[in-house]
Amino acid sequence: MRAKRVGAALVAACLALAGCSGGGTAPQPSTSARPATTTQQDSAQPSVAREEALSALLARRAAAVRSRDRTAFAATLASTTSGFGLRQLAQLDALDQLPIGRFEYGTPEAAPALGPDRIAQLGPDAWVARVEGRYSLTGCDTATRGFESYFTVVRRDGRWLLADDTDGGTQTQAWDLPDFTVVEGDGALVLGSGPASRLRPYLTLGEHAVGQVRDVWSGSTWNGRLVLVVPRTPAQMAELVGQQADSVRQVAAVTDGPFDPSGRAGADRVVVNPTAFAGLQRRGQQVVVTHEATHVAIRATTTRPVPLWLSEGMADYVGYRDVDATEQQVAAALFAQVRAGRGPTALPRAEEFDPAHTTIGPTYNAAWLAVRQVAERYGTSTLVRFYRAAASAPSADASASEVDAATAHAFQDVLHTTVAAFTRQWLSAIRAAAAG
């Protein structure tokens, strides 16, 4: 199955380029429940009139966002001077900086009821609605992204208005970042906490990454646009990707985005961990951004999953392709394991990329060397054909065995070899490099 969140660019994978040491971890899909609402009882279903009134209000709010109409937007708020009201106006200011294409809200549904204390604060008619919104960025997205909001709704002078968004599990979005700023180039758009001078270096990295990816992943329908999100703290990064802060501590960046029913991504974001990223030298930072840009391009132009060793190895191959670094530097962690008698015996399995069960730096090294072996032996264009052939499982949610079968056919049809023969050659090369 294709994962919504992929391609964690690890600090460990770039340590030789960073002048630092440590182990990397990749974020895993969250298993925790959404934040609980302040409820002590189940909610009654909203009346039809109440729901219709809120739908109309949200339609006006969405139209105000699209037209950058501050007055109309403010008219949907119970107060423009409360903490919520001020946050909402700041959110509108942030949205005004974005090239918004679509922006809309779906049909609201009742969330769990407010507790007695909140009812006493807000009034007996107050209720909480869960709303799924969707948006896209013009020139960047070929599909929409969803975002979930929990709005607390109150009646004032016969009208329903928005009073808060903290009585449920409202998802943090890029436009919620403090000091929100946008910088844009031909191939990249960078969103984050400003000033612009802080974000421009990321824009330069993104622009170069797009060119690097195009040099390899040629002939595709990718639009060549990369959206980078640069928060100010690791905690903000974790919130944006729905993770616990500890799970992203050693992650330099991660690609996050939805798939359409066919299995194609069209609204990916590369979310940066600013602290981990700052620990890398410039060339290490470029590897990280190019790694993620590779994921973005491939996710936008293929619809079927491939083994993780191939997807992560491909991203690292493109990332390191133009970097002045030896394999001894890049794969130092793997070679150390081999010399200690703990080297791989097969191509990396999916669970070996899980930091909860293993040290994954050597796994990424092994995947990189496997993909590089294909490129060096058969050529980069054949590597791309091999990847596309491997990405031909029966469906976007294909089983692991179906993915492996498609990959085995790609070995035979494109490389004219078998998985077993390729693996023997790869293992032999790793052992020779570790010994040398």
For the regions a protein language model found, what residue spans apply to each?
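Juxtacatalytic substrate-recognition/specificity segment
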Residues: E184-P307, V403-T407
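Acidic/histidine-rich, surface-exposed loop or edge segments in extracytoplasmic proteins
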Residues: T38-A44, E52-L58, T181-L199
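N-terminal export and membrane-targeting signals
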Residues: M1-A13, R50, Q285
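C-terminal motif of bacterial Sec signal peptides marking the signal peptidase cleavage site
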Residues: L17-G19
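Short, low-complexity N-terminal intrinsically disordered segments enriched in polar/charged residues
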Residues: G22-S67
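Acidic/His/Gly-enriched intrinsically disordered linker/tail segments
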Residues: D256-G263, A267, R283-G284, T302-G436
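Short solvent-exposed beta->alpha transition segments
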Residues: P46, S55, R70-A120, A405
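Short beta-strand edge/turn micro-motifs at domain boundaries
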Residues: G23, S136-D179
